[in-house]
Structures are given as structure tokens and as C-alpha cells.
Amino acid sequence: MKKLPAIALGTWSWGMGAAGGDRVFGNHLEAADLKPVFEEAMKAGLNLWDTATVYGMGASEDILSTFTKQYNREDVIISTKFTPQIAGMYGDSMERMCDASLQRFGTDYIDIYWIHNPADVERWTPCLIPLLKSGKVKSVGVSNHNLAELKRANEILAAEGFRVSAVQNHFSLLYRSSEEAGILDYCKENDTTFFAYMVLEQGALTGRYSSNNPLPEGSGRGETYNKILPQLDLLLAAMRLMAERRKATISQIAIAWAIAKHTLPIIGVTKTKYIAETVAAASISLTSEESALLENLAAKTGVDTKGSWKHPMI
């Protein structure tokens, strides 16, 4: 695997369509809007881009690929996913979806290829092996898998000399199930990179939204988070104080906390003004006392941000 930066950039909100940026995030972003973001990020050393076929049913990959094609392939790290729930019942469903991604990106390999949701570990994990052997994918990961599923996936791959190189799960101050289930410890013990998505809880942990300034109405994230924003007030107030002491932002505090947990955060950036802020977050350190305070306040919010697509991690 290529050397990974401290932070990945996520493109779930790029493009429109089913499971796309308009429906989930309330965004209506096209390539012209996002090209400056991509270029600014690459200049800043953020070259790890996370996407999935299911994001807009190919729309996110389509937009991202228009930018990656303009760069030396070795300078870009492409992370995309196979989603069993949209794959159909063909024996070669994974290879078909992988080939479609390769075609969109105009490349002959994907750096990190993920099984997006477990569905059936015994059925889908073996399908990664021919992709690894052919070189179509350089490394593989599993997303939204619990500890037992992760261990079983590793056993299946190990029989052919391969391994799960990365895990990608929802992980934030408000949702620490992967830590509670022992997945973070397992990753440390097995030299597996843990990618944390929704570190900012789709904007709810940025301090930019409140009851008076809610997330976009009619969007998936608005439906999920607007009703719980008042419960986050004490947590956000503590994060704001920590940020002010460092001349930082609340978002940076959330990202710094995730990095301190030995995770690689995936941050969705849609505006150039947030690139420098995201890069700088990797240089911020929290004391153990500060982290403990935030975790305690987060637990006291009583909110549950578990997505409908997730199952228990234990």
C-alpha cells in the first residue's frame, strides 16, 4: 500500500442521485464546483480520496475520476467500494462492479477496494482474492463489519496469502462502537489501518449548525441531526473552548480527537476554504484529560447516531 496521509477526503456528498449528495446531504455539487477543492487538496498533500459505486450510483466516482485522470496515477490514492446490496446475484458481481470503477477512473488498478457492507462474509470475501491476484486491486478493506466478521474475513484471505489491510467504520465522539467492540485494538494488534467515517457527524460536530441554523431541511442528514442538535450544546461548548485556546475550530478538535484514537479520519470537504483547516487538524494535540472530558460529555448527550445500514459491532 502507498504511504497514507493522516487524513482522507470523502466524496459521499459529490454528485446527485440515489444515495447521493443531494438526497443525503442537501448538496447539489457538480464537477465545476469541486474541481478547485480537488486541486487545493492535492497541493496540500491530501491525496487519499474515498468514494463508492453506491454514492449517487456512480456519480461520485464519475466526478472524482475527471480530476484524478489529470494527475500522475502514482500521485493519487483511490479508495472505492463494492456494495453487495446493489450487486445483484451474479457469481461475478464483485468483478463487474470493480471493472466498472476501473473504467470510470481510467486506470488498471484501485489502491484500496472495500466490501462496503458485510451482507454475507462467506460469500463475498472470497471474491476479493482473484482481484488481488490479478492486480486490479492493490489492497482490500472491509467497511461496517463487526469484530467477528472482520476476523472471519481475515481468515478467508489468509488462506490465500492475503489480509484485510484496512477497516472503515463510523467512528466519532458520538459513536464509538468500534472502540467498545475491540475493533480498534484488533486493528492496532494486526497492523490494520482504521478509517473513521462521519467523524464530524455530517456537520453536527462542526459548530456550524444549531436549532437556529439547522442542517438542510429535506436532506437525510437534516432529518437525522436537526432534532438532536440541542442535546449537543454542552459538548460543542467544551469543544469550542478547547478550539479557542488553540486558535483552532471545533471541527479540528473533533478530527484531532479521532487521530489521537489511532484512526485515519475521512473528512468530507466541499469548499476550498476548509482544506487548510483540515490539514492543520493533524497537528493539533489534545491532553488525555481533554479527551476524557469530551468523551464524558458525548456520552451524556444520550444521542444515537447509528445509521440504518449498520448492525451492532459486538
Predicted regions and their residues:
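N-terminal binding-site loop/beta-alpha segment at the start of enzyme catalytic domains
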Residues: 1-76, 303, 314
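Acidic (Asp/Glu)-rich catalytic clusters
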Residues: 3, 43, 65-75, 99-106, ...
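Structural preference for beta-strand elements that scaffold enzyme active sites
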Residues: 4-8, 47-48, 75-81, 109-112, ...
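Active-site mouth loops of central-metabolism enzymes
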Residues: 18-32, 82-92, 117
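Short, acidic/polar
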Residues: 27-41, 89-105, 124, 150-154
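Short beta-strand segments at enzyme active-site cores
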Residues: 48-52, 111-114, 252-254
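Active-site groove signature of glycoside hydrolases
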Residues: 104-123
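Beta/alpha (TIM)-barrel catalytic core signal, keyed to glycine-rich beta->alpha loops juxtaposed to Asp/Glu
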Residues: 118-314
